[in-house]
């Protein structure tokens, strides 16, 4: 808007110079900062009487304010101003000095206005230049109301949408030289337009109206082709008008249309959210296009963490390589499936992330493009058992010391028992994680009075079964000299080893 308030005062100045014929002069100036007075606003008219190179006496100025300018106040540095006659009795003015009168007027009319002033003084030998005239135009006020509507609330690519812009002048005066700007979103290509008055510049996208009378309404209709997704709109604004507008808040309007693209809905899951090191899990990713537009060159970024080692990949369409699943085009309501078989190679808590994108077409609902699956992998615990069988012909005594190191946690156990010929004893040492080591120190005694052959069989059962056989002849009797065996057992996911 050129003028958004009617309370802004304009200042007009009338200069009247008086003095001897050698120096007298008269002139009129308009303050260029306030060149467009508006109806019902306040205007200051300033009259200045200035002496030339000689003193002037009994200076009197007459200022005629035309009808429609309501004098509200005045002030002067010298003299007296008569409101009824418009006479300003100035008095004496020393050489080269000036005296001023300011009239504060309410502009209660529109159109062309002329203010005249005349000054006389004793000793003025050049009265011909003692007249001044100030002409200006008072603009009216208008309340321009702007509205815009869209023919569709939602649309698809390739549709056409019609925007109807309505401009109404609610007065009280006619509006002139109106410029209404249309700001169309990218993705709205103008196909055609029509208007009831004025003209439309489709390059500048400006609707120009010469005059809009009080109560009159004008319409601009613009048909646009939709070639992009998203929330597209026509934002309209009254950019210029000669008249002052008493209500600038209804000078702008906006109409929008929602253009949906694709809606890639991604779901990610794992077959074992709680797993153990060494387990095999399936990472399943499903992508569905909820439409309405086809997804072009759809792809999913799915990079497995280092804790998972890919064993096999199955896709019902596209290819998966280096953490990227290239699907291709997905039609409306079409889905694709990716199944990755992976082995848990280390324990810990880790996250699998997946993101679906369709670079060629905007996704109208990006909230469901991402998903996350959590896996908590622990080191598995295995039962450690030992069976000791006496294969000797005599009763034996077993003294067994076990020192178990489960990743720094030490467990010590001691067993002392007798075994008759052909009998066995089962020992359950507890549950331990993979990577545990167990040190066995076994002392086996001959309980007979005479030297005998000591023969026994130890079966270790953990991640696998391993058997240790010992056969020593000539072992002293009466438990004097035991058979000593030291062995270290390692619990590994690939099996149990004995050293």
UniProtKB/Swiss-Prot annotation:
The keyword GTP-binding does not apply. Keywords: Plasmid. The keyword Oxidoreductase does not apply. InterPro entries: Chlamydia_OmcB, DUF11_rpt, Ig-like_fold, OmcB-like_DUF11. It comes from the Archaea. Gene3D superfamilies: Immunoglobulins. NCBIfam families: B_ant_repeat. This is Uncharacterized protein ORF5'. It comes from Methanothermobacter thermautotrophicus (Methanobacterium thermoformicicum).
């Amino acid at each position: 808007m050129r003028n958004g308030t009617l309370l802004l005062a304009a200042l007009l100045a009338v200069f009247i110079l008086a003095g001897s014929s050698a120096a007298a002069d008269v002139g009129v100036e308009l303050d260029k900062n306030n060149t467009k007075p508006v109806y019902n606003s306040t205007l200051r008219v300033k009259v200045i009487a200035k002496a030339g190179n000689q003193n002037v006496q009994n200076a009197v100025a007459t200022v005629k304010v035309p009808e429609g300018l309501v004098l509200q106040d005045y002030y002067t540095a010298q003299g007296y101003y008569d409101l009824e006659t418009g006479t300003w009795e100035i008095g004496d003015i020393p050489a080269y000095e000036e005296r001023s009168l300011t009239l504060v007027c309410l502009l209660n009319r529109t159109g062309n206005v002329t203010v005249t002033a005349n000054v006389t003084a004793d000793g003025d030998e050049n009265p011909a230049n003692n007249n001044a005239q100030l002409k200006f135009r008072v603009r009216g006020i208008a309340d321009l109301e702007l509205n815009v509507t869209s023919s569709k609330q939602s649309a698809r690519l390739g549709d056409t949408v019609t925007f109807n812009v309505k401009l109404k002048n609610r007065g009280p005066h006619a509006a002139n030289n109106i410029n209404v700007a249309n700001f169309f979103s990218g993705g709205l290509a103008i196909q055609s337009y029509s208007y009831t008055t004025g003209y439309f510049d489709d390059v500048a996208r400006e609707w120009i109206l010469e005059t809009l009378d009080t109560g009159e309404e004008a319409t601009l209709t613009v048909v646009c082709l939709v070639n992009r997704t998203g929330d597209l709109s026509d934002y309209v604004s009254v950019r210029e008008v000669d008249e002052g507008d008493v209500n600038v808040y209804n000078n702008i309007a906006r109409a929008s249309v929602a253009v949906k693209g694709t809606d890639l809905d991604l779901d990610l899951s794992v077959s074992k959210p709680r797993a153990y090191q060494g387990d095999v899990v399936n990472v399943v990713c499903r992508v569905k296009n909820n439409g309405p537009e086809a997804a072009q060159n759809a792809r999913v970024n799915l990079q497995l963490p280092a804790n998972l080692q890919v064993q096999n990949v199955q896709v019902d369409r596209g290819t998966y390589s280096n953490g990227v699943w290239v699907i291709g085009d997905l039609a409306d309501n079409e889905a694709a499936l990716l199944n990755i078989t992976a082995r848990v190679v280390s324990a810990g808590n880790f996250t699998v992330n997946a993101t679906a994108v369709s670079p060629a077409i905007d996704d109208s609902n990006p909230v469901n493009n991402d998903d996350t699956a959590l896996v908590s992998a622990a080191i598995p615990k295995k039962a450690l058992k030992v069976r000791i069988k006496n294969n000797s012909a005599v009763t034996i005594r077993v003294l067994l010391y076990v020192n178990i190191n489960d990743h720094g946690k030490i467990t010590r156990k001691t067993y002392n028992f007798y075994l008759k010929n052909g009998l066995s004893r089962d020992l359950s040492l507890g549950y331990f994680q993979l990577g545990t080591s167990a040190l066995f120190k076994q002392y086996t005694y001959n309980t007979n009075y005479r030297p005998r052959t000591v023969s026994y069989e130890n079966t270790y059962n953990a991640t696998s079964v391993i058997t240790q056989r010992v056969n020593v002849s000539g072992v002293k009797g009466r438990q004097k000299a035991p058979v000593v065996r030291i062995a270290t057992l390692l619990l590994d996911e690939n099996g149990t080893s004995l050293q």
